[in-house]
């Protein structure tokens, strides 16, 4: 069952969950059907991530997805969600130019989608921008460690926060908390470093490839439930094999058509 006991989850419930030692659950969602299922299952937060560029639109990188595309997906998720807190990524190119640009992008997301918060990547360097968004009345989730929008400057998909760089991870996390973020995603960082950050902060930490010491976990649902039949990251645990099930179902459908057994009497008027 969910770690948060509420009919409608608000940002304050995440801080309360941390104080009470309750773990929180997060899944990505990009459409109404998956959002409804995950919401009814009891997930605490639904993240409309820019990972939609990969798992929905078939692109190689998250850098290409636009704010307009994110808004279309987020609208579908919020329409279907009654309980979970819906958070929407600000995609690459929508907040880096200036804090004013970031506030305008965040306002569009909130006004046009009905989401409860936005997520933004970056550490100390983005703290002022986060403060401006928060001051505009918009809740923010931060994202540090491996940040996919910075994949080229980081040298690819590599673990962050090892050795001496663990100090930067803590500094980034503190900066986001001081800027007003109510939660922060820690992606692909050593478990011990993530645990130290979690113990240092009063806001919620959400891990992805960051060990079991964070306040919660997030996975891309197509990875977690096996819709993606390709290679998956090491940190993914597969809870179902939906890709294989859909493949087999499609083959059965095709076979019934070729055999002339579908539709039958039960499916006819």
Curated annotation (Swiss-Prot):
Organism of provenance: Corynebacterium glutamicum (strain ATCC 13032 / DSM 20300 / JCM 1318 / BCRC 11384 / CCUG 27702 / LMG 3730 / NBRC 12168 / NCIMB 10025 / NRRL B-2784 / 534)
Family matches, as InterPro entries: Pantoate_hydroxy_MeTrfase, Pyrv/PenolPyrv_kinase-like_dom, Pyrv_kinase-like_dom_sf
Role according to the record: Catalyzes the reversible reaction in which hydroxymethyl group from 5,10-methylenetetrahydrofolate is transferred onto alpha-ketoisovalerate to form ketopantoate.
Catalytic machinery residues: 187 (proton acceptor)
Cell location: Cytoplasm
Descriptive protein name: 3-methyl-2-oxobutanoate hydroxymethyltransferase
E.C. code: 2.1.2.11
Enzymatic reactions: 3-methyl-2-oxobutanoate + (6R)-5,10-methylene-5,6,7,8-tetrahydrofolate + H2O = 2-dehydropantoate + (6S)-5,6,7,8-tetrahydrofolate
Lineage: Bacteria, Bacillati, Actinomycetota, Actinomycetes, Mycobacteriales
Family: Belongs to the PanB family.
Gene3D superfamilies membership: Phosphoenolpyruvate-binding domains
Molecular function, one GO term: magnesium ion binding
Description of how the protein assembles with itself and partners: Homodecamer; pentamer of dimers.
GO BP terms, alphabetized: pantothenate biosynthetic process
Positions contributing to 3-methyl-2-oxobutanoate binding: 50-51, 89, 119
